[in-house]
Structures are given as structure tokens and as C-alpha cells.
Amino acid sequence: MDRQVKGILGAKLGMTQVWDNNRVVPVTVVQAGPCVVSQVRSQEKDGYAAVQLAYGAIDPRKVKKPISGHYAKADVAPRRHIVELRTTDAGEYSSGQEVTVEEFPAGISVDVTGKTKGKGYAGPMKRHGFHGLRASHGVERKHRSPGSIGGCATPGRVFKGTRMAGRMGGVRYTVQNLTVQAVDTENNLLLVRGAIPGPKGALVLVRTAAKAKKGGAAK
């Protein structure tokens, strides 16, 4: 469904807490932007309306020629990261325009996308929350094993998607319907209520919520 989307790239700085009406609220601090518009796509030319946002300083010598030419066409200095957001109001943007945290007033609902912390190879108890086998009474050195993964003759195979040990974390993940607690326009900071994916310093994308609750921000 077509809708207007506001977005900004930033870095996760960490978590802290603030007071709101005598209640302690846990928040994540995001160093958001400023981003710059590197391209505007239109329905007539590209078949869809979208805006490209670029973020993060980078040495121009490290940018490959095709990407460098893309930025030069927009008369914008090369950036380290780029993202494209589909939005019906893309025509209101122009190449070189700066996007800041002022796009996100306090109280608005947002979706935050990032890459989760990589945990490496993990067993089924840590990866999937299995309770493990009994601590005693017949269990011998198999306390953290997953147990049976299938029958011998029926079905005679392991079903696809069976939860097992394996690499955990390090995947793209979106947390929906978080509330912007406060905005610091001078320092380009967003205080988002709750936790967001990734370690400190991780790249995150903050955009207006796709499933915002009716009647205002999510509680």
C-alpha cells in the first residue's frame, strides 16, 4: 500500500534511562544523520517513487568509480552508506537536500532496522530456548542436547526447518512500533523508547512505523 515514509540512517550509541512523569523510561540513543538525498526516483521515469539517502563520511579515494559517478551526478560528496525508501511524497525532495532528526517529532511511532549482535555457533538451548534434558535420573552427559530430531523409519529423515544448533545472530532485524521519547536537534540525537538491534556503533535505519497503532504512538 502506498504511503508517505520518513527515514534516516544513524549509529546506535547505547542505552540509558530518562524520567517521564516520575517514571523511569529505558531508551536507546541513536546518532541519527544528518543524511543527504543522493537521488530521487519518480513514477514516470523509474516506475516507482522513492528517495535515496546517503550517510557517513568516507575517503573519496576508497569509493569505486561507478558509485563516485552516482554521487557526482547529484553534486553530493560520497558517503559510506546508502538506502532507498519508497514513499509517495518523493517529489518533495531534491538532490543534495539534507535530512535531519527534525523529521521525527517526539511521540511518533517508528520502525528501527539493524543487524543483530553475532553470537557465533550456539546450541539449541541458547539459540532456540530449549529447556534441555533432565539434570539427573538417567541422563548421561547429554543435558544440553536437543533430544530426538526425528524417527528412524518414519519419516526416516529430518524435516526442513527443524530447530538445531547453528550460527546465531548477525542477521537483519526490524523492531516495530517503538516510540520516539525525545529529540535533540542540536546534537542530532534520537531517544527511542526500548531496545533496538545491534551492538554499540551499529548502523541502523529509523523510519516511520508501517503498522502504527491508531490514535497515536504505540505505548
Swiss-Prot record:
Part of the 50S ribosomal subunit. Forms a cluster with proteins L14 and L19. It comes from Salinispora tropica (strain ATCC BAA-916 / DSM 44818 / JCM 13857 / NBRC 105044 / CNB-440). Signal peptide: none annotated. PANTHER family: 50S RIBOSOMAL PROTEIN L3, LARGE RIBOSOMAL SUBUNIT PROTEIN UL3C. GO terms for biological process: translation. Keywords: Ribonucleoprotein, Ribosomal protein, RNA-binding, rRNA-binding. This is Large ribosomal subunit protein uL3. The keyword rRNA-binding applies. One of its GO terms (cellular component) is cytosolic large ribosomal subunit. Belongs to the universal ribosomal protein uL3 family. Gene3D superfamilies: 3.30.160.810, Translation factors. One of the primary rRNA binding proteins, it binds directly near the 3'-end of the 23S rRNA, where it nucleates assembly of the 50S subunit. GO terms for molecular function: rRNA binding; structural constituent of ribosome. It holds the Pfam family Ribosomal_L3.
